[in-house]
Structure formats: structure tokens, C-alpha cells
Amino acid sequence: MGLKVIQQNVHKFLQLRFWGWWKLYNKVKPLLNVARQEEEMKAKEEELRKAMAQTQELVNKVKELEEKTATLSQEKNDLTIQLQAEQENLMDAEERLTWMMKTKMDLESQISDMRERLEEEEGMAASLSAAKRKLEGELSDLKRDLEGLETTLAKTEKEKQALDHKVRTLTGDLSLREDSITKLQKEKRALEELHQKTLDDLQAEEDKVNHLTKNNSKLSTQIHELEDNWEQEKKIRAEVEKARRKAESDLKMTIDNLNEMERSKLDLEEVVKKRDLEINSVNSKYEDEQSLNSTLQRKLKEHQDRIEELEEELEAERAMRAKIEQNRKREAELLKLRRELEEAALQSEATASTLRKKHVDSMAELTEHVESLQRVKSKLEKDKQVMKAEIDDLNASMETIQKSKMNAEAHVRKLEDSLSEANAKVAELERNQAEINAIRTRLQAENSELSREYEESQSRLNQILRIKTSLTSQVDDYKRQLDEESKSRSTAVVSLANTKHDLDLVKEQLEEEQGGKSELQRLVSKLNTEVTTWRTKYETDAIQRTEELEETKRKLAARLQEAEEAAETAQARAASLEKNKQRLQAEVEDLTIDLEKANAAAAALDKKQRLFDKMLAEWQQKCEELQVEVDSSQKECRMYMTESFKIKTAYEESLEHLESVKKENKTLQEEIKDLIDQLGEGGRSVHELQKLKKKLEMEKEELQVALEEAESSLEVEESKVIRIQLELAQVKADIDRRIHEKEEEFEATRKNHQRAIESLQASLEAEAKGRAEALRLKKKMETDLNEMEIQLDHANKNNSELVKTLKRLQQQIKDLQVQMDEDARQHEELRKQYNLQERRLSLLQTELEEVRSALEGSERSRKLLEQEVVEITEWHNEINIQNQSLLVVKRKLESDVQRISNEHEELISEFRLTEERAKKAMMDAARMAEELRQEQDHCMHLEKIKKNYEVTIKDLQAKMEEAEQLALKGGKRTIMKLEARIKELETELDGEQKQHVETVKTLCKNERRLKELVFQTEEDHKTNQRMQALVEKLQNKLKVYKRQIEEAEDQANQTLARYRKTVHELDDAEDRAGMAETALNKLRTRHRVAGKGITSV
């Protein structure tokens, strides 16, 4: 089979040697192997040196064996001489035996002595172990004592912690009492303030009474004037008299109320005096408790000092644990201290319980006082409210006489106008809300469709990119494997030719050696027949022909020696030739197997190459299509982003509009409240105004409900918009992550484009975050605005109360004028800030334009890269055409490529086990070195035995000669014995020689295996180093890319932070300006209302 394959290959080589591609391959092949030629030459030279050394060793061994055979023949002649000395040796052996018996007796006596010594040492060891156990028991007792001391220490520490806890509880109770005292003092201050307020109210009421008396005097003058015009104006006089009577009745009622208030004032003063007495008593109790607390703290300090002393004593105990007597004394002291601590704890508990009782009693008294004060306070507040209601009624009755019906009608007209405006604004808001809802639904639908399409395109792109990367990696691997296999195939062909030549030579040598061996065997058989014939002759004619027998025996011995030497040399040569033959056959089989595998792998690789070329073309087309889709989807994404930004701006404008509507609604509500107050002042038109009031309240409630609904719907819309924004941000994050992954796979071709896209994505994310941050700040500002509006409402109420008195109102007007000046100044400052922010915004816009220009540059670079990709694809198509021309050559290598791919997978799986194999190889090497050492020892032993046998052979030869001399006398028995002995020795010598040859073979095998293992370990180490270097390179590249990404992100974050800051400052400035303007408008309206009230008064 191997010969057929070789013949086929030679035939194909002769056919294809003039083929153009084969010439090109022969020209290119040395260039590929130039880097490895020197290494291969060195390896071959080393192998040649090793082979030469081995052959030299074999030649030396053959020479040594020849010399040994010569020496053996000489020793065989000397055996007869040694036979004489055998008897002397036997005597010497008997003497040695006697000596050995004596030495045996001596050794037995020494053994008995050693046993006695051993028993003594065992007794000593037993005593030592008993002492050790005793010491261990003492040590365990000491440990138990130590543990008891540590438990006592832990108990004392626990008691100390309990005391600390009690002290803390006592201090907590004291702090609670102090808090209760502070609360009482605060309530006292509140009562004093309430008392002062009631006094101020009384003063105000007295002022009002004076004012009423003045009004009464004015009315009396008017009555005098009306009496003069009695006849002309009867109706007017009757009304005036009614009003006068009503005013007089009201005056009487106010005077009665004033008297009652004076009485309540006296009662309040008495109550305040009582409370002062109670507070003094509470203060005295507090002082007593403080003194008690100080005594307790002193005791606590004493206990703490005592505990510190105990801790110091305990530390001294730890230092003096070895002294048991002192420990007992200290235990007694500890018991005393425990008793003292328990007594102190009992005392402290008793004092704590007394303090708790006192505290509970004082708290109960204080609660009773507080409840009584609260009751008084509620009573006073009720009286105050009654007085206020009566005063308001008096004021209303006095003002209704002076005011006319025209004011009420004018106010009603104003209310109707404001209500119509509010209804129009509400209708506009509803329309805006409906438009926003429609836009939102449309955007949600478009967003969902876009996200779905984008996810599908991303998934397809991911799959394509994965397949492309895997295919490119497979192509590279196959190309590399194909190159390696072509190299290995060429080397295998060369080595196969060499081995064939060597095999032919070895076969010729083997045939020659076999012929020589057969001739030697024939000669040996001939000699054996001659020996047997001469032996028979010798047996028959031994007595008669002793001289002839000696001569023939000598001749036979010489011929036998020559034959044995020739046989041994032939056997050695035959063994070496068989070894060479087996080795060469094994190498030839391995090479043929490798060649078949290489052919199979090459064929498989050729098939895979064709399939891969088709798949690559298809995937390139798909990749281009997907690239177009990705570009279109990115454009659409940008369009939708712009639309979403527009919607956001529209939404923000609607929110601003809603806030302005809310503010107007609040102003309208304030005006409605003012009008309701004014409507209550009408005299005759009270019922009409009440009807209008009810109507307005109903409309106000309806407006409030509508506003609440609008606010709730707006809140819902805001939450939906925020959720949409979050979903958009999440989608953006997913898109960015996927794009980032895909661009990492296209690192080699699209680095610049990747960086630009990543920076833009980071800027978009940062912008979205900035938007979210701005919305959050906006909400915060809205809450602050609401709080400010609430505060303004409270201020408005206070102002409405202060308007009643003219002095306070004038002072307030002055304050407001000052505030207006400050607001104007702040407004100017805000204008300046706004101008600054506009400048900053223009700078940011320039920066954005620069970023856009950079993006356009990246787009241009991307287009250039795409053109390069197109050129590469064209070049790849040309290479594919060239590859198709090489398919004929690759078909032969398919089987080899398949085998190599399988081996590659096996190597990948076995790569993890290389270190274990290396360890095993090292262990095998150590074991083989040990075996080699043992074999060397065995060889040395065999050589010693051989020398002994040589000596014995010499002795036997000497004895044989003596026996031959005594053959005439001794007869046949001695000759038979000596010949049997010679045969046994010869067989033993042959067996030892065979064993020696086998040991040499095993040594060679072990050395070869050791070299292979060492070579394998070195290759595994090199592959590991290469893999580590590759991993380090990849890690360095990753670090560089990460650093570049981080720098780009930092730059983007800085620019976005500047942009956010400017936007935030601009929004703040606009909000402050709006707030200032609204405050100015409110102050102006209030100023107008106050001016009208003053003019009317």
C-alpha cells in the first residue's frame, strides 16, 4: 500500500513538475521556510550528531564485546588450572563457614544486648509519657483556673455595663424632665405672648370704639342737617334714623362686650398669676431634682472610680495568674466588691424608682396644668372670635351706610369679566391638553415601532457580525494550517524518500547478514557433528589414543572458539540490523500515516475553503445591506430625536402656560375673596350679592375641579412623558451598548468612526441626564414656588388685617416701596445675568458647531473606510479567483486538512493537560533515571558475576587439563562431569549476554522516550509563553482603548456639564425674573386696592 502511494506521488510529481503553479510554489516555498531553515538545519545537525554518537557507542560496545569474547576464550583455557585450586577454595570456604558461625554467635549476643537497651529505652519513654500526661493535667487545671478568672472578669464587666446602662437611663430621665421643663417655659412664654396679644387687641378695640364715637358724633351732625331738610327728604331721614338707632344699639353692644372683655382680662391676669406660682413650684421641684441628680452623678463617679480601680486590680491579676494564693485573696476581694456593687445597684435602683415616682407625679401635675391652660386658651380664642365677629359686623353696618350700590355693581362686572377670561383660558388649556394627548399617543406608537425595528436590525447586525468574525477567524486558521501542512508535507516527502533509501540499504545489509548467519549456523552445526564424532571416538579409544585426543581436542577448542566468536559477532550485527530495520519500518509507517492524514486534511480544507468563499460572498452582501439599513435607522433615530426634543419644548411651554394660568387663577381667587368680603358689606343688596356669591363659589368650585382635573391629567402626562423619556434613555443605552460591542468587533477598520459615535452617544446620554436633572430642578423650583405662594398668601392675609389700621398700612406701603426698589435692582441684575447666559449659550453653540464639524469629519473618514472595504472586497474576489485555480492542488490535501482540523481540536482540548503531562513526563524521566541507575548496578553486578565465572572457568579448565592428564587413570566419569559443567557455564554465559543485550535495548528505548518527553515539555512551554505574550498584547490593547474611551467621555461630560450649567442658570434667571414680575404685579394690585380703601375711608 505504501509503495503504491509513493509510486502514485512520484508519477504525479513527474506530471506536474513543469506546471506553472508548481514552479511558483517551488519558488515561494523556500521564501516561506527561510526563517525556519536555519532552525531545521540545526535540528538535523543535532540529530546527525546524536546518531553518529549512538553509532560510535554501538561500535565501541561491539569492540568491547569482541575483546570480552577473546578474554573468555583465554579464561576458558585457564579453567583447567583453576580446577586444582578448587579444593583449596573448598577448604577456605569451610574455614569461612566456621568464621561465619562465630560471627553469627557474636551478632546474636549483640542483638540480645540491643534488645535489653531497647527495653530500657521503652521504660524511659513510658516514664516520660507519664510525666508528660501529668504536666498536661496540670496545664489543663491551670487553664480551668484561667477560664474561671476570665468568667469572673466577664461577669464584673457585665455588671459594670448594667450600671452604665442604669446611669444612662437616669440621665435620659433627667434629660426628659429638662425637656418637659423647657416645654413648660415655652408654654409660659406663649401664654405671655397671648396675653400681650389680647392687650394689643383690646387696645385696637378701644381705638375702634373711639373711631365709632367719632363716627357717632359725625352721624349726629348729619342728623341735625337731616332735621333741617326734614320736609324735603323724609325717606332719607327715616333711613338715617334707623341707621342711627342700629348704630346706637351696636354701640351699646360693643360697650357691653368691652366690659365683658375687661372682666375676662382680669380673669386672665388671675390665671396668669396662678400659672406663675405653679411655674415657681415646678422650678423649685426642678432645682431639687437637679440637686438629687448631682448627688447621683457624684455617686456614679465614685462607682466609676471604684470600677476603674477594680479593672486595674484585674489587670494585675492577669499579670499574676501563676500565683494561686494571691488569686484566692483577690477572689475574696472580688466577692466583697460584688456585694458592694450589688448594694450600690440596689441603692441606685431605689433612688431611680423614687425619682421616677416624682417625675410621674410632676408630669401628671404639669399635664393637668397644660390642659387647664389649653382650656383657658380655647375659651379666650372663642371670646376673641366673637369679639372679632361683632367688630366686623359693626364695621360692615357702618360702611354699608356710606358705600353705595355702584361699587358692588362695578365689582360684579369685574367678576363677570374675570370669569369669562378664566373660562376662555380653561378652554384653551383643554384644547392644548387634547393636542398634547394626541401627540403623545402618536409618539408612543412611533417610538414602539422604531424601537422594534431598531432591535430587529440590531439583532440581525449582531448575528452577521458574529458570523463574519467567526468566518474570518476560521479562514485565518485554515490558511495557517494549510501553510503548516504544506510545509510538513514537503518535509515528510523528503524524509520518506530518505527513509526509503535507508530501508533499501538496510534490506541489502540484512540479506547479506542473514546469508552470513546461515553460513555460520552451517559451520557451527558441522563443528558440532565433528565434536560428537570425535567425542565418540574419544570415548572408544580414550585409553589407546590419549596423545591424538589431546591434539584433536586442542584443535577442536580453537575451532570452537573461532566459531563462537564468529557467531557472537554475527548475532550482534543481526541484532543491530533488526533494530535498525524495526526503527525504519516504524518511521516509514508513521510517515505514511501522516501523509494519508495530510492528504485527507488538505481535501477537507479545500472543501471548507470553497464553502467559506461562498459564505463570505453572501455575508459580505448581507453586511453591506445591513450597513445601509443601520445608516437609515440612525438617520430615522436622529429625526425622531429632533421630534422628541420639539415635543419636549412644546410640553415645557405648555407647562409654563399652565403655571401662568395657575397664577392668574390664584389672583382671581384672591379677587373673588376680596369681592366676597365686599359683598358682605352691602346693605339692601345683601341677598343679591349672596346669590352672586353662591353662584361665584359654584363657578369657583367648578373651576377648581376643572383645574384639579387638568393638573391631575397634566401630572399623568408628565409621568408618562418621564416614563417615555426613561424608556428612550434605556433604549438609547441598549443601542449604545450594542453598537459599542459591534464596533469593538470592527476595531481594525472603523476605530475613528467608533470613537466619534461613542462620544456622540455619551453626549446624548449626558444631555438626556441633563434634561432629567433640569426637569427635577424645575419640579423642585415649582414646589419652592408653591411654598412661596403659600407664604405670600399668609402675607396677604396679614396685609388684609393690617390694612384696617391706617398707620400700619402706610408703614407697609413704605416697606413695599423699598421692596419694589430692591426687586427692580434684582430685576436689573437678572437682566445682566441673562445677557451673560446668552453669551455663554452662544459660546456653547459654537462648541456644538465644532462638535458637528468633527462628526462630519468622522463621517468622511467612515466613507473613506467604506471605500477601502469595497477595494478589499474586490481584492478578495481576485484572491478567490486565484484560489479557484488552486483547487486542483487543494483537493489532494483535503484529507490531510480534515485530519489536521481534528488534531487541532484535539490539541485545543489537550492543551489544558500539557502541564500535567509535563509533570508526568518529569516523573517518568526521574523513574527512568532510577531504572537506568538500577540497570547500571545490575550490569555491574553481572560483570562481577562474569569475572567470577571467568575465574571459575579458568579453574575448571585447569581441572579439565588435570582431568585429561588423569583421564587414563580417572576414567569417563570425571570427563562427563567437567563437560556438563562447561555446558552449564556456557548456557549461563549465553543467558547473561542475552540479558545484557535486552538491558541495552531497554536503556536505548528509555533514553529515546526521555528525549521525546523533554522535547514535548519544551514545546508545551514555548506554546504557553506564546499564548501568554498574545494575552498580554490583547490586554494592553484593551487598556489603550479603555483609556481613549474614558478620555472621550471625560471631554463630552465636561462640555455637557458646561452646557447643563448654562441652561440651569438660564432657567433659574428666567424663573427668578418671572417670580419678581408676578410679585411686582401683586404688590401693585394690592397697592391699588389699599389706595381705593383709603380713598373710600
UniProtKB/Swiss-Prot annotation:
It comes from the Eukaryota. It holds the Pfam family Myosin_tail_1. InterPro entries: Myosin_tail, XRCC4-like_C. Residues 31-1087 form a coiled coil. Specifically expressed in muscles of the head including temporalis and tensor veli palatini. The keyword Oxidoreductase does not apply. Gene3D superfamilies: 1.20.5.340, 1.20.5.370, Myosin, subunit A. GO terms for cellular component: myosin complex. Keywords: Coiled coil. Belongs to the TRAFAC class myosin-kinesin ATPase superfamily. Myosin family. Has most probably lost the function in masticatory muscles contraction suspected for its homologs in dog (AC F1PT61) and apes. This is Putative uncharacterized protein MYH16.
